From Swiss-Prot:
Record bears the keyword Iron: no
Induction of the gene: By stress.
Family, similarity comment: Belongs to the UPF0664 family.
GO molecular function: chromatin DNA binding; transcription coactivator activity
GO terms under cellular component: cytosol; nucleus
Name recorded for this polypeptide: UPF0664 stress-induced protein C29B12.11c
UniProt cross-references to InterPro entries, sorted A to Z: WBP2-like (IPR044852)
Amino acid sequence: MSINWVTYKEGSESDILLLENECMFDCFDGVAISILCKPPSLKSWTCTKGLLCLTNQRLVYIAKDTDCDFKDFQSPVANLKDTKLNQPFFGANYYSGTVMPVPNGGIPCEAEVKLQFNEGGIFNFVEAWNRLIQRFQEVDSVSRVQHLDPLPPYHRPSSSQDQPPHYEEAVNKS
């Protein structure tokens, strides 16, 4: 995760430049974010209004409120752990989780992230997020499969001596 490291397309303050092999899944406007580092750091960042973008590689938040402590936030999808949907009795629904730091990202230690969807859209976000996590898990499980030696190639018997017993009878019956 990193603070103020998002690269924008030229002439735009909200259109992010996608990484290689990255595609945009969805964007959600009117999202508030709070990032609270766990002890011993206790640093925190908050913003009451911004744009949240979900790609196949990362979660990107762009602050739209000028009073925010930061301009943008991004985290690789694989660095978000223990995520969950929270539905309080009073207040807007929010999504929370633990974010692991990246080297030189501006955030010193793992942090608790809270995304509050003030203008709706949380269920669309959760659906897209769950599909993305499922893809990550499928790729991870495929990479862990033990690859055995390949089967030898099949060669059709060239003579009747190479054929199994009663082969001719079985072929002629059909």
